[in-house]
Amino acid sequence: MARYTGPITRKSRRLRIDLVGGDQAFEKRPYPPGQHGRARIKESEYLLQLQEKQKARFTYGVMEKQFRRYYEEAVRQPGKTGEELLKILESRLDNVIYRAGLARTRRMARQLVSHGHFSVNGVHVNVPSYRVSQYDIIDIRDKSLDTVPFQIARETVGDRPIPSWLQVVGEHQRILIHQLPERVQIEVPLIEQLIVEYYSK
């Protein structure tokens, strides 16, 4: 599956948001790249909407075509479209691995899933976009438990808050999905209504 593999710090600076999490290069220069990066420019309504959509895309590591499909699915849901879109993005397996603290970034989580380190309800899953459901159980596969990424994860457990809609239990770091997240449980600096307005034009 296609994914963006370019310089993510540059995207962070362009969108004025740390897309990685703990990006020291962004923290040093949290303004757009280029000669006029520090200059204040008047941003149009369309530009603000586009930037918010791009923030969401790059935060979750989703290409435009797939993001559009997620939006169209969210439109068909009975709740608020923007909130439903965020719920869909949060339910991706790579995001769940990141939220559970088993990977430092979503990029790393995506790589771990792609390399076949996880099973869901006892079934091997290596698709980062796989969508989890309430009551799903995610396990690190036995052959992967002693690999470096998961040794580090065990040592750093608790460094980042784990959202209440999931739980990590035991030394094998099993992930339990208690529910799919509500908007108040999704901590991302996004104004989802701007994304809805962008696609509604």
From Swiss-Prot:
GO cellular component, one term: small ribosomal subunit
Organism, as annotated: Mycobacterium leprae (strain TN)
Subunit architecture: Part of the 30S ribosomal subunit. Contacts protein S5. The interaction surface between S4 and S5 is involved in control of translational fidelity.
Gene3D superfamilies: Ribosomal Protein S4 Delta 41, Chain A, domain 1, RNA-binding S4 domain
GO molecular function: rRNA binding; structural constituent of ribosome
Gene designation: rpsD
GO biological process, alphabetically ordered: ribosomal small subunit biogenesis; translation
Start and end residues of each S4 RNA-binding domain: 91-157
Family under the similarity heading: Belongs to the universal ribosomal protein uS4 family.
Protein name from the UniProt record: Small ribosomal subunit protein uS4
Keywords annotated in UniProt: Ribonucleoprotein, Ribosomal protein, RNA-binding, rRNA-binding
Lineage of source species: Bacteria, Bacillati, Actinomycetota, Actinomycetes, Mycobacteriales
Role, per record: One of the primary rRNA binding proteins, it binds directly to 16S rRNA where it nucleates assembly of the body of the 30S subunit. With S5 and S12 plays an important role in translational accuracy.
Keyword Transferase attributed: no
CDD domains associated with the record: S4
